[in-house]
Amino acid sequence: MAGRDPRDRAPRVRNRAPAAVQITAEQLLREAQERQEPAIQAPKQRVQDLEELSEFQARKRTEFESRIRYSRDSILAWTKYAQWEASQNEYERSRSVFERALDVDPRSVDLWIKYTDMELKARNINHARNLFDRAITLLPRVDALWYKYVYLEELLLNVSGARQIFERWMQWEPNDKAWQSYIKLEERYNELDRASAIYERWIACRPIPKNWVTWAKFEEDRGQPDKAREVFQTALEFFGDEEEQVEKAQSVFAAFARMETRLKEFERARVIYKFALARLPRSKSASLYAQYTKFEKQHGDRAGVELTVLGKRRIQYEEELAYDPTNYDAWFSLARLEEDAYRADREDGEDVEPMRVREVYERAVANVPPALEKRYWRRYIYLWLQYAAFEEIDTKDYDRARDVYKAAVKLVPHKTFTFAKLWLAYAYFEIRRLDVSAARKVLGAGIGMCPKPKLFTGYIELEMRLREFDRVRTLYEKFLTYDPSLSSAWIQWTQVESAVEDFERVRAIFELAVQQSLDMPEIVWKAYIDFEAGEGERERARNLYERLLERTSHVKVWISYALMEIATLGGGEDEDGNEIEGEAGDADLARQVFERGYKDLRAKGEKEDRAVLLESWKSFEQEHGDEETLAKVEDMLPTTRKRWRKAEDGSGELEEYWDLVFPDDEREANPTSFKFFQAAQAWAQQRAGQGEEGGLSYDLPSDSEDENEDGDEDGDGREEEGMDQD
């Protein structure tokens, strides 16, 4: 590398800008083609006389002999040599070369074909026949030689000779294409009986469904339907009635039915379809079912179409279940499908057995969920319930339905979770069988094994329907011993006692309830107060409100307390239907409650609750008060004022908010400025009344009329929420 001349290196390109004239690949190719020198052509030789011809032939033979001497196994060299001799009309020499080549490779199909082609070109027919005879004797499994031999004889109109060649060929039991060629030969010359005999020999050699169908189609096309039926019947007898054999012969059944359809024999076709489908499993007969469905839609009645659609849907569901056996939706669909089919057959007057439906249900419930989690079992347990309902309603097999319920109860892992719907369905089944004691035993076992609120509720509802109030009380005692925090259970118990007019027991139950740690204590207190108010016991209701206010001082409790004081309690109708006037309320007591509530909320600094209370108080005064009391409440209503405070995100920035300003708070905090503020506000209202512009820029109007409606709605909607401060 050190002695390399630097001048040999390629020059460095300094200007990388594109050239003004661009050269394309097309120009390069065109220029290369123009500059290409002409190829050397061999001189043409013209033979002038026989001497020169003999010299030329001798030279070419020498070349060919030299070539095959060095490449003796090259069939191409031998073929070229023989064909050149044939081109010189030296057929004897050409045959000699071909024979020498056959000595080298007698099994070369290409060599035999070119040898026969040479003889045929020279119109040496007998030589060609002899060659074909030698070839098929030596190579009987090469179809090309047979085809060429047959074609030669038929071309020469030697049909009998062609038939003899086919007969020799058929002795070797060739493939189906050879048999079909033989049959087509006979058809071309209208030898249909011979063709039918060939079909029979072909079937004996290769009895596959396709060949049977082809034979039957041939007989049908030549106007022999009875013969075609005989062919199909022979085929079906050959394949047999076993499942595997019928599956193999599906195409034969389908072709047989299609032929009968073409011949307008619809009942025959229907019988053929049903015969095959009855012996095949649903998963293996999808195509046959599809053809049967199409047949029924075209030529069947409504019942037949429904039956075929039923079978098609069966196959679809079976395929889904084969992929996922725990697909309970597919099991439900399949079970409903079988139930509908069973009911339809029974309505048609057929004597059907429910074995197919039971088989589906048994297979379905055998697929137990893999995990002990209730979310996996929810759909599964409905299979058992639907199974039991089918046995009870459709088959009237009550003992079997009871066994289904028992098996389901035994299967569920009750220590982990249970299903109240299962226990209740089992119990109501026993009720329908008029066995009340058995139903009680079932529900008792369920409560003893796995108590849950829904199970208690269902058992209590059953006893209520039976009017067994002592049992209902016992059940409620067990229910609340199991879970004393259920507010709804306490209320339901009091409703039961109210229905039997045992009011002292109702009060005792409520007293027990309010002493418990309830999940929703506000609804229990409200129910207790509503009960006393409904009985006209205002003093008892007042005591309950006082006890409730000791626990919570929510604004809704105060509002409800005040409205109770003004409401009319008691009343109703006596035994004769005469109306009884209730005890009227006292507006002064209601105002006292409002005042107490306002003071309590003011002491706690609850501005929003105070505003809600004042709005309710204002509505009360508008309905039950006079102008003086209403004006007093309106003077207590707050106004809105825009103020600023530090942001809660800790950034130190100020944020704007609207604050409620109560007159009594301002009066106590700034008595002097409050008087000035009142005078300024009165002056602003006076000017507004005269139609002049002006006002206080720092004090916005309170919009008390709009807030009236909003406050009332809020007050009513938050009534129960206020009692949740227990």
From Swiss-Prot:
Compositional bias segments (type: Acidic residues): 702-726
HAT repeats: 55-87, 89-121, 123-155, 157-188, 190-221, 223-262, 264-298, 308-340, 352-386, 396-432, 434-465, 467-499, 501-534, 536-567, 585-626, 635-667
SMART domains found in the cross-reference section: HAT
Subcellular location as annotated: Nucleus
Name of one Pfam family that matches: HAT_Syf1_CNRKL1_C
Keyword Nucleus on entry: yes
A cellular component annotation (GO) from this entry: post-mRNA release spliceosomal complex
A GO BP entry: mRNA splicing, via spliceosome
Region called Disordered, residue ranges: 682-726
Keywords: mRNA processing, mRNA splicing, Nucleus, Repeat, Spliceosome
Family: Belongs to the crooked-neck family.
Assembly and binders: Associated with the spliceosome.
Function comment: Involved in pre-mRNA splicing and cell cycle progression. Required for the spliceosome assembly and initiation of the DNA replication.
Protein name according to UniProt: Pre-mRNA-splicing factor CLF1
Name of the gene: CLF1
